[in-house]
Amino acid sequence: MSGIGSKRAAGEPGTSVPPEKKTAVEDSGTTVETIKLGGVSSTEELDIRTLQTKNRKLAEMLDQRQAIEDELREHIEKLERRQATDDASLLIVNRYWSQFDENIRIILKRYDLEQGLGDLLTERKALVVPEPEPDSDSNQERKDDRERGEGQEPAFSFLATLASSSSEEMESQLQERVESSRRAVSQIVTVYDKLQEKVELLSRKLNSGDSLMVEEAVQELNSFLAQENTRLQELTDLLQEKHCTMSQEFSKLQSKVETAESRVSVLESMIDDLQWDIDKIRKREQRLNRHLAEVLERVNSKGYKVYGAGSSLYGGTITINARKFEEMNAELEENKELAQNRHCELEKLRQDFEEVTSQNEKLKVELRSAVEEVVKETPEYRCMQSQFSVLYNESLQLKAHLDEARTLLHGTRGTHQRQVELIERDEVSLHKKLRTEVIQLEDTLAQVRKEYEMLRIEFEQTLAANEQAGPINREMRHLISSLQNHNHQLKGEVLRYKRKLREAQSDLNKTRLRSGSALLQSQSSTEDPKDEPAELKQDSEDLATQSAASKASQEEVNEIKSKRDEEERERERREKEREREREREKEKEREREKQKLKESEKERESAKDKEKGKHDDGRKKEAEIIKQLKIELKKAQESQKEMKLLLDMYRSAPKEQRDKVQLMAAEKKSKAELEDLRQRLKDLEDKEKKENKKMADEDALRKIRAVEEQIEYLQKKLAMAKQEEEALLSEMDVTGQAFEDMQEQNIRLMQQLREKDDANFKLMSERIKSNQIHKLLKEEKEELADQVLTLKTQVDAQLQVVRKLEEKEHLLQSNIGTGEKELGLRTQALEMNKRKAMEAAQLADDLKAQLEMAQKKLHDFQDEIVENSVTKEKDMFNFKRAQEDISRLRRKLETTKKPDNVPKCDEILMEEIKDYKARLTCPCCNMRKKDAVLTKCFHVFCFECVKTRYDTRQRKCPKCNAAFGANDFHRIYIG
């Protein structure tokens, strides 16, 4: 393709000029290398040789150009890579420099309190590398991006200005930027120094001992910190806003980068495809050049020559002779005339065919109408019509009879089915009633059983509790009786000890009166000091043992009480949980019973509404059964309440056992106190015996004084003992009252035991009642079973009725059979009539055969006419063809007789060149050459038209309206 185009282009500037003139023109402009063509016999050979040499030179020039293009392409790629690395490094430097300036500005805003530095670094300029514009379709997008970015930053295109400016201007601009950064850094240093000075002043004021200075420093520091806080808050808000805007811009830029990367990948793929296409075209061009050279060599070697006034092999193509061109034009005109003649003939034939078809249809319609009229007028048709009408009337009558029989049969069947359905409905409703009643009774029975089981379990629990409490109660009775006896004995002993004390006091008074001498005092002085501390020790030990014993007994009692209290609390908690569970179960059962009763009542109401007129007796029975069941339910609920009360009574028993434990502890305490009193009485008796012995001794007089002192001490002790005795007596009274309370409590417990026994008896009676109810329910169940049997008997009776109805149905079916027999006889008569009709049809067939014979003869005549007309048409056709041949031969004769008025070959070539140029120009704009192909439909246009169509979203082929996309058009290179 490119080779052919280049050859034409080389030969375009006037082919009529001879080669000598061409060389002269070339010499006038440029120096051309001389080429030896060898021996040439004619101008045609000279043209061929010159063209061959031109082709070779052009091929060499193309190879050189291709090599230069490859070198330049590699050089361009290297430069692009270098530029990309330089741009990347410049962008990195600019980014970090701008970041540095931004950080300096933020630091100044952060620390400079005196002046607002919002506009400090307005001179800061961002290094932005202008991206290359690879395609025309992306230019508009970049313009839009620039328009958007113009309002965002004041100095946006620093690198662009650097690229457009000279080296001196670049140095000045960079110097300005460095100066601005240096000034910002120096300002940071000054700000930091100011802050340092301020901090030092505040620290001096704070460190100074003066309170006023400290207050001033604190106030200044507070104000400073408040200002700093507000400034920092503003700064954080500003930075947050900036961060938001930057994040949004970053997301936008990231999306743009992704789209650009996808576009770059698409463009790279397109470049690869185009490169591959170029390589392919070049290979093809080289192959064609080689092939053309071989063809030319063969032509030269074999000695082919092309003669004619303007014939020449130009650019690898052989031009056409003018005479041949005229001949071809003449032939084309003749062919046009022939085509017109043929078209006229075809039109005539089509019109004739339409006329014949219309006549044929008319004749068919006339034939049909004529045959029907003829058949209707025949006497056989009229006879058949009368017979058909008679038979049709008879068949209608038979149909009416048959329909009546069918309606009767359907009616009887319908009534029978309705009766059966009614019986089945009654049976189903009765079954449902039975089921509901049985289910209700079973539910009530199950509830009664559950309640009975619950009561039995509770009764067993109460029995077990009573069995456990029985031996405890017996032991308590024995203990109480033994304690009563023991208390009586203790009272007697106390009275006896009181008497002994009175006697001892009287004896002591007597001894006081007797002892008066000093001898007894001296004798007693040696022995009494030894005895007194021993006695005192004994008394103190007795008191300690008494207090320890009382404390131990109290602790034991408290421990027992605490254990019992814990056990009772656990029991109470368990019993409460059981009660709650039982109450929940009972509530659930009650709800179920209510739901079931509601459902049963609804079902009964529905059943009653359906069968009000039929089952009055059944209603009364059901109402009585329901009343009985309700009464039994009420009784069961009352018995349940009584059982609950009994359970509560049994649960209250452990609390009374607590009082028993307290009484036991009080009794133990009183026993211990009585034992202590006995021991003290024994000690006093021993002392009296010792004193009597001492008084009998000779040294009694000496010890009188000591005895008097001892008497005083003993008097004090006696007063103490009296007080203790009074306390013991009060305690004895308290124990007596407690004992009386215990007796009363025991009486109450006995009453409760009796009540429990009565409750147990009631439970047993209720159990007997429940057994009786169970028996009654069984009897009711048996009655219901009897009712079921009666219903079954009713169903059997209804089945008998159904059988009778079926017998009636059989009778009706026999009647239908007789009717069908009559119908068969009628059908036989109809068949006889059909036979007659068949005979008439045979007659009609004979007539048809005669008619067909006549039609055959007519067809034969028609065929002969058609054959004659066809032969005539053939003769006419041959005559026309002969006339056309004569006219064509006459034209040839005229052309041979005419002189040679053939135009020059250069004019023909120029017209061909114009035609080819018109073909190579774009049909959309009629300006540019075709250099883009649509791969969907393979129509060729210029790349600018296709691109504008793609950008303006008119993505359809201008010729065939085939849709195309971004990857569906490619560049092509034609010469």
Swiss-Prot record:
It holds the Pfam family zf-C3HC4. Residues 139-151, 527-540, 558-622 have a biased composition (Basic and acidic residues). This is E3 ubiquitin-protein ligase BRE1A. The keyword Zinc applies. The gene is RNF20. A zinc finger (RING-type) spans 922-961. Component of the RNF20/40 E3 ubiquitin-protein ligase complex that mediates monoubiquitination of 'Lys-120' of histone H2B (H2BK120ub1). H2BK120ub1 gives a specific tag for epigenetic transcriptional activation and is also prerequisite for histone H3 'Lys-4' and 'Lys-79' methylation (H3K4me and H3K79me, respectively). It thereby plays a central role in histone code and gene regulation. The RNF20/40 complex forms a H2B ubiquitin ligase complex in cooperation with the E2 enzyme UBE2A or UBE2B; reports about the cooperation with UBE2E1/UBCH are contradictory. Keywords: Acetylation, Chromatin regulator, Coiled coil, Metal-binding, Nucleus, Phosphoprotein, Transferase, Ubl conjugation pathway, Zinc, Zinc-finger. Pathway: Protein modification; protein ubiquitination. The modification Phosphoserine is found at residues 41, 136, 138, 522, 562. Transmembrane segments: none annotated. One of its GO terms (cellular component) is ubiquitin ligase complex. The modification N6-acetyllysine is found at residues 21, 348, 510. Its EC number is 2.3.2.27. SUPFAM superfamilies: RING/U-box. Residues 43-90, 168-375, 429-898 form a coiled coil. InterPro entries: E3_ubiquit_lig_Bre1, Znf_C3HC4_RING-type, Znf_RING, Znf_RING/FYVE/PHD, Znf_RING_CS. Residues 1-37, 125-155, 507-622 are annotated as: Disordered. It catalyses: S-ubiquitinyl-[E2 ubiquitin-conjugating enzyme]-L-cysteine + [acceptor protein]-L-lysine = [E2 ubiquitin-conjugating enzyme]-L-cysteine + N(6)-ubiquitinyl-[acceptor protein]-L-lysine. It is found in: Nucleus. It comes from the Eukaryota. Component of the RNF20/40 complex (also known as BRE1 complex) probably composed of 2 copies of RNF20/BRE1A and 2 copies of RNF40/BRE1B. Interacts with UBE2E1/UBCH6. Interacts with p53/TP53 and WAC. Interacts with PAF1; the interaction mediates the association of the PAF1 and RNF20/40 complexes which is a prerequsite for recruitment of UBE2A/B. Interacts with PA2G4. Interacts with FBXL19. GO terms for molecular function: histone binding; p53 binding; transcription coactivator activity; ubiquitin protein ligase activity; ubiquitin protein ligase binding; zinc ion binding. Residues 543-552 have a biased composition (Polar residues). Belongs to the BRE1 family.
